[in-house]
Amino acid sequence: MRPVILDVEGYELDSEEKEILAHPLVAGIILFTRNYYDIEQLKALVKDIRRYAGNELLIAVDHEGGRVQRFRDDFTRLPSAGSLIEKNDMKTACELAFSSAWVMASELIACDIDFSFAPVLDLNGISNVIQNRAFSSSITETVTLAEAYINGMKSAGMVSTGKHFPGHGSVEADSHTALPVDSRSELEIFTKDIKPFENLIKKGALDAVMPSHVVYSQCDLQPAGFSSYWLDDVLRTRLGFKGVVISDDLSMHGASFVGNHLSRAESAIQAGCDLILACNDRSGAVSILDNLKVKPTAQYHAVNQLRSTKNKFILPLNKNPIWIKNKQMLMQLSEQF
């Protein structure tokens, strides 16, 4: 089992990164804005990552749209999830969700990037870090728009990752800088926040799920990403999820209360994560690679599935009529946001 997804520092690989990529625990790389200058540079970086890894590995990015879009120049400007329904009826919003996801996925795949960590399934509530990254505060609207978005991703050949299970929208604190605590009752969480995940799992729409670094104090005292209650009892057993569980970044402040990076990695895997993100802290990531002991799990085949649906486009995107049509729709929408 190769469970660790890491980051790289810049536009090109340094000597340490070339060595790290060949480590037997490395499953993938997540890219950030700092890794992008232009499309040709990005393609060269991805090619080098794959070459030095030796084994096939995942390359991912957060490319939701709106304020969370890592690559901008020469990529289509993508709308935030929340903007889709603000000025449109549901039929139009679903068409835009599909188009946005298809364009996002096709442009990333054209650069040999496997997937974006999307969509956000949190309900829009009091969370400043979520806000319009969420489709809506309505369960029905969230499920409908998310399903259209996922269909767009899959039509282009990309898998989906629903986040942040079981819901990050009802806490004010940002788990990047604090440990949010959601003190609502189990009943409220299960009748509201968890519903988009539950419904999309029933539909077989989700390939992967990313849990939050939030404590739901009336349910369990561990953050969800380190909680066997949330990942095993609820997600796997109660909701019947068969896909891949990917931790949020273990370097986030919301994960620091579990211990050092090795303890975080061990706890996340023990709780039920199949893949773990260790970003923006090289020494912490190296300590995981040097010391983590893992065993193969039943999810190893599912982890491989994250890259099995990737397509390569025969036509260049600027000559692909589907891309041209969808891009034009998004350009019209961009005038509204």
Swiss-Prot record:
Q: Reaction catalysed?
A: Hydrolysis of terminal non-reducing N-acetyl-D-hexosamine residues in N-acetyl-beta-D-hexosaminides
For the site labelled Important for catalytic activity, the residues are 174
- Provide the residue positions that the database annotates as binding substrate: 62, 70, 133, 163-164
Report keywords, A-Z.
Cell cycle, Cell division, Cell shape, Cell wall biogenesis/degradation, Cytoplasm, Glycosidase, Hydrolase, Peptidoglycan synthesis
Gene Ontology MF terms in the entry: beta-N-acetylhexosaminidase activity
What's the name of the protein?
Beta-hexosaminidase
From the UniProt record, report the name of the gene that encodes this protein: nagZ
Key word Transmembrane helix present? no
Function, as annotated, reads:
Plays a role in peptidoglycan recycling by cleaving the terminal beta-1,4-linked N-acetylglucosamine (GlcNAc) from peptide-linked peptidoglycan fragments, giving rise to free GlcNAc, anhydro-N-acetylmuramic acid and anhydro-N-acetylmuramic acid-linked peptides.
Name the domain of life this protein comes from: Bacteria
Query: Which species is the source of this protein?
Result: Psychromonas ingrahamii (strain DSM 17664 / CCUG 51855 / 37)
* EC code(s) of this entry: 3.2.1.52
Q: Which GO terms describe its cellular component?
A: cytoplasm
Active site (record annotation): 176 (proton donor/acceptor), 248 (nucleophile)
| Gene Ontology biological-process annotations | carbohydrate metabolic process; cell division; cell wall organization; peptidoglycan biosynthetic process; peptidoglycan turnover; regulation of cell shape
Q: Where in the cell is it found?
A: Cytoplasm
Give, as in the UniProt entry, the pathway in which the protein acts: Cell wall biogenesis; peptidoglycan recycling
Asked whether the UniProt record includes Hydrolase among its keywords, one would answer: yes
Q: Which family does it belong to?
A: Belongs to the glycosyl hydrolase 3 family. NagZ subfamily.
Residue ranges that the Swiss-Prot or TrEMBL entry lists as coiled coil: none
